[in-house]
Amino acid sequence: MRSRSNSGVRLDGYARLVHQTILCHQNPVTGLLPASYDQKDAWVRDNVYSILAVWGLGLAYRKNADRDEDKAKAYELEQSVVKLMRGLLHCMIRQVDKVESFKYSQSTKDSLHAKYNTKTCATVVGDDQWGHLQLDATSVYLLFLAQMTASGLHIIHSLDEVNFIQNLVFYIEAAYKTADFGIWERGDKTNQGISELNASSVGMAKAALEALDELDLFGVKGGPQSVIHVLADEVQHCQSILNSLLPRASTSKEVDASLLSVVSFPAFAVEDSHLVELTKQEIITKLQGRYGCCRFLRDGYKTPKEDPNRLYYEPAELKLFENIECEWPLFWTYFILDGIFSGNVEQVQEYREALDAVLIKGKNGVPLLPELYSVPPDRVDEEYQNPHTVDRVPMGKLPHMWGQSLYILGSLMAEGFLAPGEIDPLNRRFSTVPKPDVVVQVSILAETEEIKAILKDKGIDVETIAEVYPIRVQPARILSHIYSSLGCNSRMKLSGRPYRLMGVLGTSKLYDIRKTIFTFTPQFIDQQQFYLALDNQMIVEMLRTDLSYLCSRWRMTGQPTITFPISHTMLDEDGTSLNSSILAALRKMQDGYFGGARIQTGKLSEFLTTSCCTHLSFMDPGPEGKLYSEDYDEDYEDDLDSGNWMDSYDSTSNARCGDEVARYLDRLLAHTVPHPKLAPTSRKGGLDRFRAAVQTTCDLMSLVAKAKELHIQNVHMYLPTKLFQPSRPSLNLLDSPESPQDSQVPSVHVEVHLPRDQSGEVDFQSLVSQLKETSSLQEQADILYMLYSMKGPDWNTELYEEGGATVRELLSELYVKVGEIRHWGLIRYISGILRKKVEALDEACTDLLSYQKHLTVGLPPEPREKTISAPLPYEALTKLIDEASEGDMSISTLTQEIMVYLAMYMRTQPGLFAEMFRLRIGLIIQVMATELAHSLRCSAEEATEGLMNLSPSAMKNLLHHILSGKEFGVERSVRPTDSNVSPAISIHEIGAVGATKTERTGIMQLKSEIKQVEFRRLSVSMESQTSGGHPSGVDLMSPSFLSPAACIAASSGSFPTVCDHQTSKDSRQGQWQRRRRLDGALNRVPIGFYQKVWKILQKCHGLSVEGFVLPSSTTREMTPGEIKFSVHVESVLNRVPQPEYRQLLVEAILVLTMLADIEIHSIGSIIAVEKIVHIANDLFLQEQKTLGADDTMLAKDPASGICTLLYDSAPSGRFGTMTYLSKAAATYVQEFLPHSLCAMQ
């Protein structure tokens, strides 16, 4: 008989340990593990982690088998794992209705339960009696389902189960925007049942999605139908949000030890090695103690100060748990595993020794890992005074099976029984390894032969869409519809993937659908409902963004391939040449670089071997040879009106396979194109219809008169509040380019001269006749507007003999017409009438919220300014925006547009939003108009009109300059660049010498430019280089510096007006006021501002801002680094409606925070910040008067009472705001200051 090897003996020892601590508790029927002896429920997360030691031991036996007996042990252990995983599957599959509902609702009431009955797999508590929504638990199950399947275990047994797992993928793919209760089941750390976005859930979901992608759940015995499909864009959404959260864990937890499972084993979800190390160091620095790590700061679980009879904490109670949080040895097991996977032998040795010291020896010397160590109740005060000095006692479960399992797994790996690749067969541990450079393949296609000829004349040789056959080209929305059939199962009542827009990663692959290759055009070209794709410059910008995104986020095998079609809308207005922006982009791509990406242009057929190609096996024919299974026909036949056209498919011919699929997609394409005479709109009647009609082209006086004729009472109740002034100007009536001879016809308001019949009523037929005769697009829009408001959208004008035409249809036709000539003011105007909404609006809103940015729409104060703090359904979101816009459809449309741009920048340049936690879109729009008025030296009316007439690309560019803080200027010309009707307004970056880029390079000189642009603001570096903090060459005492710009002093409106007598000496006037207005509107504060506010609150009873108090008790609930605290402070500051005044209050608070570093216990009760600002204002006025300034120069802002010059003063220097604010703060709190500090007075 062969003797047992040493390794075999050691493995037998681990087998005894596993049986005595884990497997002895496994239910023989369900395979589930109870939480402990006294807690018989089975938690999903704990079960998965607890079985890992069994799985690892089985792999070790399989690898190190000395005898057949060892192989039998390996099989037994592996089947114990399979039994548990299938037990959890049975628990969840019983709740299949919840999975179906949650895909659409993301509601906590529709979530899978977090724990089940160990004996029956049934639920144990009600939907609303536990924090069930824990996406990390479902994700960790799916992650190890993938890893175990890849290691050779057979867990999934039927296609029904495959479909269920596919729907679990849809369940977790929205983790990046779903607030849940997290790994500790508490949600917000106040333990009041408030869900929040958790980095641990997002990271684990990202790992599970990546692990399952293209995995065959039947293993080597599977086929195409058992493969799981994951959309790469959803994975990257999770990655973006995860990177934006880390090293924070959530809005209420600035750090959490559970993040170890995200940055290291098992998820390995973070690709940035620096961020991985930063997160680990945060955990070690802030959470590690002598017995393990705290879960998070101020965690009250099982501490002596926790009241076990009360489920929730009081917010101020959290301070009691500081420094006495329980320490969990569990997290040291993660550090051991992390050291093994990263090859850090010293780390492994250090934490193994530390863990051995806290293990408890059980019966027969069995090492047991306790759940946690707590401070003894009689030594709490001692621990408060000297943290980490008191000896703690073990509490909770013994052993803690989750920790016990990871301890055993770490020991097996540390002793060489398992290699990292065996426990991680999907190679997730290489996530931080640098990826090879990405070359984006771009295939340029011409829509027609004519466009191909035009491109050839420019030296660009392309194919037409017809010439790439047999490769099929389809728009992105078709791919969304195709994926909506993925996971369908009528027997389980699973509908498949919810319809969502397709991202650029999804459209940059080729797809094999029944042996036919399909390629899909980018989503941004396929904008059906909104007008962004009408702007060729915007198309170029979105293409540049997508290319850059692909280079940084592409992780799949093969190179990304973008199919870029050139359509007739990308031609110039004469249709004989290509738009200059499009042509320039094509030339750059041909040169090999565009948008920071390496580009390879070529034919689609040349890219077949190098592209990433996905086989959509779920599109393969069913058992009877049909294109789809019966499930899909039932779900989508009615929606697509497909009839029986696909029932006669004959599967014997591969050629006919491709043709049949093509016919199906063509049919689908036809049904997804909106009918040209059925543009989306909403019927309005009565007063609502009238209110909708009060818009930019309406004369208010004539509307009042017309309202009397319509017998509408209290008409002023329905007139919208204007954005910038009491009465919004009407847009200029600009004639159609087809009739230049009419260009001198004066602009008229149609409603002023409404034709009347003999009885005095409005003669609508005459109005229709006017509509037919006029060639002015503006007049056509005005007339249709009046018909829309007075007769309704479905009124038949009988304009055409055959069938007539409704108002809605005519507006849609006009929309197309103005779109062709790029009249952006009218495009937005008609888009507002027709209630056209941006398709990705709700996704844009959700993206912003997922980055922990709250949104407000409308202008302050509340309740006019509406706050969006959680994702909303599309209809609810558009309704809220309409309400905040107070009936102004143009503002409503612009708000949606700005929201989309903000989301674009958030995804690509999140650094623009540093230290901003609330994006106030109403104020941003107002500031954009103000900047136009200031830069162009024009009136409010002209600025408003100019803003509405900006092209989408120019609007996005202006927004970027405002967000980035770059120097920029604006030029206006009567010679337009892209339209015969819209005035051109271009935004240029300012160079070091103060000229615009175009002037500096001499590319173009606009003879008709109105005025030289001026700087947006002076850079801090420029200011610091000058004496006293003021720009060199500026006389501080000169009227041009001390007084407001003459135009501001003389103007009674919201914006400065043109002043001809201004000189170049005045060019810097208003710079600091503009900067404060911008920073205040954007909620921009200095780095570390909120942490400093937290410190000052500890030394006073609170800060008062215009009557709203930020109490010191806030610090008892929240820690300095919490996003929740920053949002709370920001919400108090946002009570101030004037942005520049708000920013001055921020500067005053900054001065106060300097007092926090002084060794003083208290600096008073509640500090009124606005009083400090007003004291500083008085000091400033006194000093300026002694220097000879008169009352005209020292004009005050009527809203705040602050001198305009103080707003326009630089922060530093003798006359800087910080000087006066420091003196004012010292005056206000001098009785609490040391005597030496009062000397500054």
UniProtKB/Swiss-Prot annotation:
One Pfam family cited in the UniProt record for this chain: KPBB_C
Q: Which pathway does it operate in?
A: Glycan biosynthesis; glycogen metabolism
Q: According to the lineage, what is the superkingdom? A: Eukaryota
Per the UniProt entry, what are the Gene Ontology biological process annotations, in alphabetical order?
glycogen metabolic process; positive regulation of glycogen catabolic process
> What's the family?
Belongs to the phosphorylase b kinase regulatory chain family.
The gene name reads Phka1
Protein modification: Although the final Cys may be farnesylated, the terminal tripeptide is probably not removed, and the C-terminus is not methylated.
The protein's UniProt keywords, in alphabetical order, are:
Calmodulin-binding, Carbohydrate metabolism, Cell membrane, Glycogen metabolism, Lipoprotein, Membrane, Muscle protein, Phosphoprotein, Prenylation
**What does the record say about activity regulation?**
By phosphorylation of various serine residues and by calcium.
Q: What is its main location?
A: membrane
Q: Where in the cell is it found?
A: Cell membrane
An example GO CC term for this entry is:
plasma membrane
Topology term for the membrane: Lipid-anchor
Q: What is the protein's name according to its record? A: Phosphorylase b kinase regulatory subunit alpha, skeletal muscle isoform
Task: Give the Phosphoserine positions (modified residues).
Answer: S629, S730, S736, S739, S759, S812, S973, S982, S986, S1008, S1019, S1021, S1024, S1131
| Connected disease | Defects in Phka1 are the cause of phosphorylase kinase deficiency in I-strain mice.
The keyword Glycoprotein is assigned to this record: no
Q: State which tissues express it.
A: Both isoforms are expressed in muscle.
What this chain does, per the entry, is described as: Phosphorylase b kinase catalyzes the phosphorylation of serine in certain substrates, including troponin I. The alpha chain may bind calmodulin.
Calmodulin-binding: annotated span: 811-841, 1064-1104
Q: Does the keyword field hold Transmembrane helix?
A: no
Q: Which InterPro entries match?
A: 6-hairpin_glycosidase_sf (IPR008928), 6hp_glycosidase-like_sf (IPR012341), GH15-like (IPR011613), KPBA/B_C (IPR045583), PHK_A/B_su (IPR008734)
Query: Which molecular-function annotation in GO is an example for this chain?
Result: calmodulin binding
Q: How does it assemble?
A: Hexadecamer of 4 heterotetramers, each composed of alpha, beta, gamma, and delta subunits. Alpha (PHKA1 or PHKA2) and beta (PHKB) are regulatory subunits, gamma (PHKG1 or PHKG2) is the catalytic subunit, and delta is calmodulin.
| Positions of S-farnesyl cysteine lipidation | C1238
